[in-house]
Amino acid sequence: MIPVRVRVRVRAVFFDAGATLLYPDPPVEEVYARVFSGDGARFTAGDLRDALAATWAAVQAEEKDGGDRYGGVRGEAEFWRAFLTRVRGLLDGGVVSPAAFERLAAHFRSREAWRVYPDVLPILEHLKAADVGLAVVSNWDSFLPRLLEGHGLSPFFQTVSVSAIEGTGKPEAEIFRRTCARLGVSPEEVLHVGDSPRDDYEGARGAGLRAVLLDRDDRHPHVAERIRSLSEIAGIAGRAARPDLIGSAPTS
């Protein structure tokens, strides 16, 4: 891969969902600790934070790149039951009760469990006013479109591509290419923004899109093309992409 600088008008911006548009409030580990306490277990939020991080790392290591981790919409519950079992197994080897599973599932599918970052609405309004196409590309459950609708974000997006519905996910190129086709744009005319170096930054670039990493907490200083806030992409609307902001287009 040889980086080249090409000024191409950005006609569309794709956004990741979690840690880009939305964040859980209260934090995930606090919710798990509270629900597990209903089964008689006593874990701190720190305990859960470590167990969740270790479980996600193991799941990602086992996944085939781009494979839908849920096995389609019908496999979502099975995936999360197995995930919860692994989390609890790391903590004390205990069993997650059906009631605990249902409480967690209901919580995270509710609008009230999620908040929209303060920089989201201003940038969406700005880009929409500039006639820039907008889409969501996310590795998420099938309820994401309803969640976006509940927060009033759906009207901004021409399409929402969700891995559980698409049957493919990031970093695989297919989900990016499908979204490009739905908006009628070529990959080089798209900027993708998300928080995952692998799924968002590398995945989008591998599909021929431009990409920036949204690094809200300054965790990835090794990635040159990163931003700390969505407001930093406002300058791309309606004109050629700034190479210093958006980075190089991948080529072989």
Regions found by a protein language model. Name each.
Residues 1-13, 23, 46, 94-100, ...:
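Asp-based, Mg2+/Mn2+-dependent phosphohydrolase catalytic module
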Residues 5-118, 130:
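N-terminal helical cap/lid subdomain that shapes the substrate entry/recognition surface
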